[in-house]
Swiss-Prot record:
Essential cell division protein that coordinates cell division and chromosome segregation. The N-terminus is involved in assembly of the cell-division machinery. The C-terminus functions as a DNA motor that moves dsDNA in an ATP-dependent manner towards the difSL recombination site, which is located within the replication terminus region. Required for activation of the XerS recombinase, allowing activation of chromosome unlinking by recombination. It comes from Streptococcus pyogenes serotype M18 (strain MGAS8232). PROSITE patterns: FTSK. GO terms for molecular function: ATP binding; ATP hydrolysis activity; DNA binding. The chain crosses the membrane at residues 31-53, 58-80, 89-111, 131-150, 155-177. The lineage of its organism: Bacteria, Bacillati, Bacillota, Bacilli, Lactobacillales. It comes from the Bacteria. Residues 720-739 are annotated as: Disordered. This is DNA translocase FtsK. Residues 464-660 form the FtsK domain. ATP binds at G484, S485, G486, K487, S488, V489. The gene is ftsK. CDD domains: TrwB_TraG_TraD_VirD4 (cd01127).
Length: 801
């Protein structure tokens, strides 16, 4: 017995490993799959009694979809692993197949012979008949499974509705078989809707432009027709040889009146909508009489000058030309600009009610008792005016800007503590959507005096009121902000506002555009002294020409005995009223520099000297400057420039340092961009937040074309800077390093290639010492390649390779 037990213990049963177990399972699964496949093949081929019976049993389950069902089953048996790897493939096939079952059964019970039969009994009777007779002859729809699905669907949605439900099942199954998810589909639908909306808006704008072009063409044709009739009338006039008076016969007068009546078309009212129907002519009789009177006066002046020498004879010709050109000049109207789009800020009102409660709760959590007095919804921000309790220090509220931004889930929060003229503190919170302020809307709502030629609407305040500024009182303006913040749009708005109010003989422009693309659209308008200057080296000479004009005007004022341009022009008007010899008033001059930093890189000393001299003395001479730059650093906006350009306009900047350079205080770094600005005029101690107006390129082109159609450019050679060369000794710009370190060009190339700048990198890559590397960094900063040091932050590379 002992030996027998020992023999049993010495031969224990061997346990299979996990791999062996898995292998056995795979073998069993393969055998089962092969047997199942043979069974399905017999059924598909209907071989003998066994095949027909098996096929009818499958038909009993899925009806006439037996073949697709068996084919899908075969694929599942041999491609199981592949199907498991495809997310949603099996579920999609099952759901789509269920939809087909519903469709097939709905088709079955739409047949006349099945209309009055019970769904389950009728389906079972058809299948059982074939099963017992060992045949396959009847169409049985979706089998018993189809009957099970079809009965509740048909009860709820009828037979026709069953088709629609089955189709939805099929679509859902196909969608699950695709690699897309519901987010992809919704995103695709959203993009398609957005594209349709954009296409609709573009078509709408194109239709508007087409209508405007047709209107302008009609008005132009009417004006040409009127001019032809005027020429015809003048040709038919006869002059009395004895008295020299014009004798008009009644026939010519009648024909002229008829021609004038024919030109009174309704479209002309678009230029002067305030005129009555009987005043709808583009140039009324008073204007024509005044023009004839002036032309006669200047003709007599030319005859008087013909008795003098040849050089003097040229002057009356110029004087004669200018008044006759501008007497019939018509100012552009606001109809040239695209109409304003309606705005809906009802969403903001609901958000404001919620934010008032959040603000009070947040202050309460910090132990500060405040009350929100009012909230003003502006185009870009909402201003909450809060009243702190007695004894609450203002700086406690000012220090909570970041906490308030967190509580309100806002991009940034600007605190105005206190609001000038009020015992309240303002908290400016960005709106969920910035409402665009169009130039046309701002112009129609502004109360700018049309007599003040340089008073232009600038933007809308937080309370929605239009704010205007008079450049003559500024007297110069500095516009600064990062790229894309809205500087160029603001400059275009200022130029367009002046063009809307001033004739070419009243205001002249000198435009300097080193970028070559911002102001070039204004070329060839009659308001320009010279074509738009795009060469930075020419720009410094052009500014010097303006300085010379300023000095000449002061000498003229001294001789006449007046203090400013207004006094001089008054003297001219008095002289013209009492004398036959006419003098032309001096026009105002507006100098616009679109990128000051580029000029300072090429000729910093000359440009800075000219700007400082103009800033100190040009106001009384009627010369004003608008300086724009996207690089508000101290090497561009020097202390002397800031002292002589007291009015500032700051758009969004990247840091508080840039904001302090522009405004002498923080705040611009919290702006939102897209025209959001802080405006600090000369007569205010604190900046005002405004949303600048948007003027499109199409609007600018329309007003420019309107002006060009009336008068041609008449450039003044006295302001022409002439030709300049790169070797001109008069320039002392910082654009190169001829007298600097020999490795300057290598260091510059390294910085431009890597777009990084540090003394340690120059040490390592150029194998130089620390002192030499720091000197190279200083030279790169002076050359405008890199920005100034900002503490521990890396220096910004201002140029690209």
């Amino acid at each position: 017995m002992v030996k027998r037990n020992q023999r049993k213990k010495s031969a224990p049963k061997k346990r299979l490993t996990k791999a062996e177990v898995e292998k056995q399972r795979a073998i069993k699964r393969m055998i089962l799959s092969v047997l199942m496949a043979l069974l399905l093949i017999f059924a598909m081929l209907r071989l003998g009694v066994f095949g027909v019976t098996t096929y009818n049993m499958i038909r009993f389950l899925v009806g006439s979809l037996a073949y697709p069902f068996m084919f899908a089953w075969l694929i599942y048996l041999f491609c199981f692993k592949w199907l498991r790897q495809k997310d949603g493939m099996i579920a999609g096939v099952v759901i789509a197949f269920l939809g087909l079952l519903v469709e097939w059964h709905a088709f079955l019970f739409a047949m006349p012979r099945m209309l009055d039969q019970d769904i389950f009994l009728g389906t079972a009777r058809l299948i059982t008949r074939d099963l017992l007779a060992l045949r396959v002859t009847e169409f049985v729809g979706g089998g018993m499974l189809g009957a099970l699905l079809y009965k509740p669907i048909a009860f709820l949605f009828s037979n026709i509705g069953s088709y629609f439900i089955g189709f939805l099942f099929i679509l859902l199954g196909l969608f699950l078989m695709t690699p897309w998810d519901i987010y992809d589909v919704s995103h695709f639908v959203k993009e398609a809707v957005d594209k349709l909306a954009v296409a609709y808006q573009e078509n709408k704008e194109k239709r508007f432009i087409k209508r405007e072009e047709h209107r302008l063409q009609t008005e132009k044709e009417a004006l040409e027709k009127q001019a032809q009739e005027e020429e015809k009338r003048l040709a038919e006039l006869t002059v009395d040889p004895e008295t020299g008076e014009i004798v008009e016969d009644s026939q010519s007068q009648v024909s002229y009146d008829l021609a004038e009546d024919m030109t009174k078309e309704p479209e002309i009212l678009a230029y002067d909508s305030h005129l009555k129907d009987d005043e709808a002519s583009l140039f009324d009789q008073e204007d024509l009489a005044y023009a004839h009177e002036k032309i006669g006066a200047y003709d007599s002046l030319s005859a008087l000058a013909s008795s003098e020498d040849e050089m003097d004879m040229d002057e009356p010709v110029e004087v004669d030309f200018t008044p006759k050109t501008h007497l019939l000049y018509k100012l552009p109207t606001i109809d040239l600009f695209a109409p304003d789009k309606p705005k809906n800020q009802s969403k903001e009102k609901n958000l404001v009610r919620k934010n008032i409660k959040v603000l009070e709760d947040t202050f309460q959590s910090f132990g500060i008792d405040v009350k929100v007095e009012r909230a003003e919804i502006g185009p870009s921000v909402t201003k909450y005016e809060i009243k702190p309790a007695v004894g609450v220090r203002v700086n406690r509220i000012s220090n909570l800007a970041d906490d308030l931004a967190l509580a309100l889930a806002a991009k940034d929060v600007r605190i105005e503590a206190p609001i000038p003229g009020k015992s309240l503190i303002g908290i400016e919170v960005p709106n969920s959507e910035i409402a665009t302020v169009s130039f046309r809307e701002l112009w129609e709502q502004s109360d700018a005096n049309p007599e003040n030629l340089l008073e232009v609407p600038l933007g809308k305040a937080v309370n929605g009121n239009a704010r205007s500024f008079n450049l003559a009182r500024m007297p110069h303006l500095l516009v600064a902000g990062s790229t894309g913040s809205g500087k160029s749009v603001a400059v275009n708005g200022i130029i367009s506002s002046i063009l809307m109010k001033a004739r070419p003989d009243q205001v002249k422009f000198m435009m300097i555009d080193p970028k070559m693309v911002e102001l070039s659209v204004y070329n060839d308008i009659p308001h320009l002294l010279i074509p738009v200057v795009t060469n930075p080296r020419k720009a410094s000479k052009a500014l010097q020409k303006v300085v010379d004009e300023m000095e000449n005007r002061y000498e003229l004022f001294s001789k006449i005995g007046v203090r400013n341009i207004a006094g001089y022009n008054t003297k001219v008007e008095e002289f013209n009223a009492s004398s036959e010899q006419k003098q032309i008033p001096l026009p105002l001059i507006v100098v616009i520099v679109d990128e000051l930093a580029d000029l300072m890189m090429v000729a910093s000393k000359e440009v800075e000297d000219a700007i400082i001299r103009l800033g100190q003395k040009a106001r009384a001479a009627g010369i004003h400057m608008i300086l724009a730059t996207q690089r508000p650093s101290v090497d561009v906006i020097s202390g002397l420039i800031k002292a002589n350009v007291p009015s500032r306009m700051a758009f969004a900047v990247s840091s508080g340092t840039d904001s302090r350079t522009i405004l002498d205080e923080n705040g611009a770094e919290k702006l939102l961009g897209r025209g959001d600005m802080l405006f600090k005029p000369i007569d205010e101690n604190h900046p005002v937040r405004l949303q600048g107006s948007f003027i499109s390129d199409d609007d600018v082109e329309r007003i420019v074309n309107f002006i060009k159609d009336q008068a041609e450019a008449d450039y003044d050679d006295a302001f022409d800077p002439g030709e300049v060369s790169d070797n001109d000794p008069g320039f002392s710009g910082n654009g190169g390093a001829a007298e600097g370190d020999p490795l300057f060009e290598e260091a510059k190339a390294l910085v431009l290639e890597t777009q990084k700048a540090s003394a340690s990198m120059i040490q390592r890559r150029l194998s130089v010492g620390f002192n030499r590397a720091t000197r190279l960094m200083d030279e790169l900063e002076e050359a405008g390649v890199i920005g100034p040091a900002e503490g521990t932050k890396p220096r910004k590379v201002l140029q690209t390779n």
